[in-house]
Amino acid sequence: LTTVDHKRIAALYLGTSLFWFLAGGLEASIIRAQLAFPNGKVVSAEMFNELFTMHGTTMIFLVVMPLSAAFFNLLIPLQIGARDVAFPRLNAFSYWVYLFGSIFLNVSWFVGSAPDGGWFGYTPLTTLAYSHNLNIDFWVLGLQILGVSSLAAGFNFITTIINMRAPGMYFMRMPIFTWMAFIVQFLIVLAFPVITIALVFLQFDRFFGTNFYEIAQGGDPLLWQHLFWIFGHPEVYILILPAFGLVSEILPTFSRKPLFGYPVMVYSGMLIAFLGFGVWAHHMFAVGMGPIADTVFGVMTMLIAIPTGVKIFNWIFTMWGGVLRFTTAMKFAITLVALFTIGGISGVMHASPPADLQQTDTYFIVAHFHYVLVAGSMMGLFGGVYYYFPKFTGRMLDETLGSWHFWLFFIGVNLTFFPMHFSGLYGMPRRIYRYDVGQGWETFNLLSSIGVIFQILGVAIGFWNFWRSRNVGAIAGNDPWGAPTLEWSIPSPPPDYNFARVPTVTSRYPLWDVKSPALTSEIPHSRLGEERVEVEVGGHHTGKVGHAIGNPPGGPVGASTRVPGSPLTPVPPRRLPTAHELGIPMPNPSIKPLFVALFMTLMFSSLIAIHKDKVQLAVVLVITFAGAMTASLYGWLLTPLEDEH
């Protein structure tokens, strides 16, 4: 409750987002049960609307984004040679806001008012004229709360990456994951204010009688669509770029080759982010914007496929000629490359307005974005879990169980979503809760529903693997994979201070410089000539010879003598010196961020009382919780960050 350690906050993000992944998966399973056969009777039309709305909202805002945030928290300080993030308490605050916001959003299930307007909440369907109850209020307020969390984290990570890189860690030496995370933070801080404006307008229309989206009063429902998709399409890259970064860490390690075209990978990520703000209206070709607007946004949609395609080929060339090791993490990474390509091809089709008009709001679109976000984002994130689990926990995951997880999930994803292309082309609209016999959709829907069973089995095995391996997995050591970046130079799990001495970096692959200099002979280094980085671990020198760092007398705790492909030979663990013993100042734990987040959430949620015709109660509650939040914030600001050493 009081931690401000970025690694523990990463664990909190990971556990919470995986819990909501199960909840979102349950919602999807009920949807597929309803659609498995014609005229399904599993749920009512009203419940179906709530299920698909909350499934989309949960998977995007409560699963993929915070699961990416777990990796941001764990890896960014470790990869840049920092001891923590720039603002540790703000980091804790962003997690607690996410937790309380996600709980608030899902409380709606228990009061019979789950959001039911679709995850992009088109007006006027979400205005009071068509939605009288609290359903949309929970959605509007919940997303505003979650937006505060995302913005706080975004500014924190931008500051961390700019200001806290180790000596010699120039921008063009940062690991690709940190680069993609850096780009994502700019997307967040630029995109989330737009959706906040849209939500505030809708909130004012619903709560205070304004007319931003009310047609009869001169409002414009298309304003919502423009504002939402100016946020919504960059959001796609907020969801996928972290997975791209993880894949760009996994493939070089298990190919035993540096990443092909590192600068191009960086610039393509920047270009994707830049162009991502110029393609939003391809979601709106069906609303009648006119031929000029359709042409402009169609061309922009074609252009954004270029930097994305560059990444695909760079990953392929990274593996080409390498010594490949097909670990579970590698399987997930390769699968992202293959399946995201399918999602990209089905997506660039919609750069053509005539084709888009035929496919809009059909299951073809559902197939497309699930190939991007499940076969793309989730495959990459699962690969990241398998790759970094040893660093999180100090234990190895079971590769046999990992293979079962991968293959069942792989089969399930393709069996679920590939047939949706055809049901969509045969004319099946999305969001219908039942369909008649004889439409030609029966086989495709049954296959999609069977595929969910495979996904459930795969995820269940994966979760069992995660839970079991925390305690009984093989000891990992510092670097079980023979990886090239700084995070693998320190003990697993890392000490609270990360690095006993801040390392000096002379190339993109500091550990390969130490362990396998032949692999980095063509990588640019600093002007220090042939001198290689000497990473300090736990107060001890790592050494420079051999493929993997050895464990000399008095050497680092848990260092591995493993060469890829050979059995792991862990070192018996010994106690690491504490930050106090080493004289390293570290931020103190604090409960204040939790209180600020709690009272802020309660302040937002108090507005619900307005729709119960209890305006005076709402005012009293808002003022009370705002005062409590302000008092907690003063306590936060007046408490010293660190003890004096």
Residue ranges and their predicted role:
Residues 1-550, 554-645:
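Membrane-embedded and interfacial regions of multi-pass energy-transducing membrane proteins
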